[in-house]
């Protein structure tokens, strides 16, 4: 993959991830002045995850690092724009949720209940369920860690 192709794919990924970030921000009644920042943060998070996955990281660690980035930037923007960090961060991480893995695990569970147990279906179910659970865990931990780092009252030692 050439550099130009990678940059075009990255731009496409960032633009397409900004759209659901704004959509969910509107569902969550985010103020209108914060909508462009939610889009930018969603694009930065998803784009950084794509860059890390292209560099060879697996999707779980890439999601964790991207959600750390989203959480840190969201805390900084909340200080600048006098809003709660969740205004920016929650809608921004929703495009990184593992829809395909969760859907595949659910379909495998339905097939097992309908057709009976088979080892390939069980392997598909467990693999996709564990992947989806790990990604959701990485998102939640990655969003909460910057707040624990930056809002700490006691000394670290």
UniProtKB/Swiss-Prot annotation:
Disulfide bonds: none annotated. It is a multi-pass membrane protein. The chain crosses the membrane at residues 8-28, 55-75, 87-107, 129-149. GO terms for cellular component: plasma membrane. Its main location: membrane. Keywords: Cell inner membrane, Cell membrane, Membrane, Transmembrane, Transmembrane helix, Transport. It is found in: Cell inner membrane. One of its GO terms (biological process) is succinate transport. Involved in succinate export with YjjP. Both proteins are required for export. The transporter is composed of YjjB and YjjP. Belongs to the ThrE exporter (TC 2.A.79) family. This is Probable succinate transporter subunit YjjB. The gene is yjjB.
């Amino acid at each position: 993959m050439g550099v130009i192709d990678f940059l075009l794919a990255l731009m496409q990924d960032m633009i397409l991830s900004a759209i659901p970030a704004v959509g969910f921000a509107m569902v969550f009644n985010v103020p209108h002045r914060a909508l462009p920042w939610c889009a930018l943060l969603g694009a930065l998070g998803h784009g950084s995850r794509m860059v890390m996955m292209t560099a060879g990281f697996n999707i779980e660690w890439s999601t964790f690092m991207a959600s750390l980035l989203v959480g840190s930037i969201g805390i900084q923007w909340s200080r600048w724009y006098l809003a709660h960090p969740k205004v920016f961060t929650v809608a921004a991480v929703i495009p990184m949720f593992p829809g395909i893995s969760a859907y595949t695990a659910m379909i495998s569970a339905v097939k097992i209940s309908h057709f009976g147990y088979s080892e390939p279906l069980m392997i598909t179910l467990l693999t996709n369920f564990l992947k989806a659970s790990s990604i959701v865990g990485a998102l939640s931990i990655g969003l909460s860690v910057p707040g624990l780092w930056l809002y700490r009252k006691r000394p670290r030692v």
